[in-house]
Amino acid sequence: MGFLRIGGKKLEQAADFLKDSKSLYELMVGRNVSDFRKITQFKNWTIGDVFGHLYVFNIAAVKTLESSAEFDNFFNPILEKLQAGRSFLQAQTPLLKHYDELELFEIWWESSLDVNEKYSNTDPKKRIKWAGPEMSARSSVTARQMETWAHGQEIFDRLGAVRNDGDHIQNIIHLGVATFGW
């Protein structure tokens, strides 16, 4: 029996994650590939690199809801590359090399919708595995929102666009305070 069927309430943080994802989608939809190849201020990543990174970790967030084993099967090859001294970009390349920037943008958006759907219907207190310490589903989707918002800001900055934030970013502020010592 699903969480919502036994009286659970939808996880509002999932909807907030989707708001930040949607603002990025609306900023980039219809742009040509040259925009996705622009270098951001973050480690010389391109806008396309950012979407690749967000996509990979959206997939990881869905895999961990399925099971710890699914997460490990997906994430361990990335972790091995990181432990061998590779960068995140180098570690994620094998997963993304079959997509051009525009295809990657579209699958990132689809993965964002999937994260929202899966986490909306998950018990917020469910404990799930991650690369760092285990966390609640609520913390996991808030971390996805935080990463989407933060990497999104580098895209807004690079394109000279103004972002209109709202109260939904309070989740990010709470997460920052709660994890400051960690």
Regions found by a protein language model. Give the residues of each.
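Short, helix-capping/interhelical loops that line the mouth of catalytic, cofactor-
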Residues: M1-E12, I59-N116, S120
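Short amphipathic alpha-helical segments, especially helix-boundary/capping motifs
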Residues: M1-G2, L24-E26, D35-K38, F88-T93, ...
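An N-terminal domain-cap segment
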Residues: G2-G52, A61-K63
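Generic detection of long, well-ordered alpha-helical segments
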Residues: A14-L18, F51, E101-F105, W109, ...
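Solvent-exposed alpha-helix faces
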Residues: K22, Y55-V56, L113
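Short, contiguous alpha-helical
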Residues: F36-K81, W130-W182
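Contiguous mid-protein beta-loop-alpha structural module that forms a pocket-lining wall or clamp
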Residues: T93-G160
